[in-house]
């Protein structure tokens, strides 16, 4: 039987709770985080503010970036299947950036610059190849968040929990410092309700006008891709060597 002293148990509990507390700070959020697909990142590779172009990633995913002084950026590319017609999936690309706030209870609130958000909605079997491009502004509230070291993936993971407590898919640290566009209003207008074009309401543009595959017009950045903390191949070969050595010693004894 293994006995654990009260002091050791208290130390473990203190370590656990200190991790949770430390996770609720701007320092822990700092960087660019991306979903498991590792294909969607914030920054100029997703949205070109000069031409107001959303650039389609190779796979769906989500990405958030945070600075230590209260700015954020969001890039999402979601694809939904059509149960009635599998050949007619819908896709939505969304860009937002602005300021964030961490409340005393750990709640994370993202408040975008209203005039800068963009969204592209594509329903090829409905819109006949002409996607809808419009301004987008939506405040996001996360009940809480936590940052931890995911030993399986060898990366730091960001866990976000929506306002109702339901978890968002884990995001993994990809760049630090973050890969972001300038943290200012990129497309100022006279009023927040103005559209991306000169005409009233939102205008429909062809998909080819608005989405450019690949990473185009990528500006210079100081962001550095965050490598995995562990080399899977190295540890695999080390494990294999230990097993082999153990087998030899077993038969020699």
Swiss-Prot record:
<feature type="topological domain" description="Lumenal">
    <location>
        <begin position="24"/>
        <end position="232"/>
    </location>
</feature>
<keyword id="KW-0732">Signal</keyword>
<dbReference type="GO" id="GO:0006458">
    <property type="term" value="P:'de novo' protein folding"/>
</dbReference>
<feature type="glycosylation site" description="N-linked (GlcNAc...) asparagine">
    <location>
        <position position="105"/>
    </location>
</feature>
<keyword id="KW-0325">Glycoprotein</keyword>
<dbReference type="Pfam" id="PF10681">
    <property type="entry name" value="Rot1"/>
</dbReference>
<feature type="transmembrane region" description="Helical">
    <location>
        <begin position="233"/>
        <end position="253"/>
    </location>
</feature>
<keyword id="KW-0812">Transmembrane</keyword>
<comment type="function">
    <text>Required for normal levels of the cell wall 1,6-beta-glucan. Involved in a protein folding machinery chaperoning proteins acting in various physiological processes including cell wall synthesis and lysis of autophagic bodies.</text>
</comment>
<feature type="signal peptide">
    <location>
        <begin position="1"/>
        <end position="23"/>
    </location>
</feature>
<keyword id="KW-0256">Endoplasmic reticulum</keyword>
<comment type="similarity">
    <text>Belongs to the ROT1 family.</text>
</comment>
<keyword id="KW-0472">Membrane</keyword>
<dbReference type="GO" id="GO:0005789">
    <property type="term" value="C:endoplasmic reticulum membrane"/>
</dbReference>
<keyword id="KW-1133">Transmembrane helix</keyword>
<dbReference type="GO" id="GO:0051082">
    <property type="term" value="F:unfolded protein binding"/>
</dbReference>
<dbReference type="GO" id="GO:0007118">
    <property type="term" value="P:budding cell apical bud growth"/>
</dbReference>
<protein>
    <recommendedName>
        <fullName>Protein ROT1</fullName>
    </recommendedName>
</protein>
<dbReference type="InterPro" id="IPR019623">
    <property type="entry name" value="Rot1"/>
</dbReference>
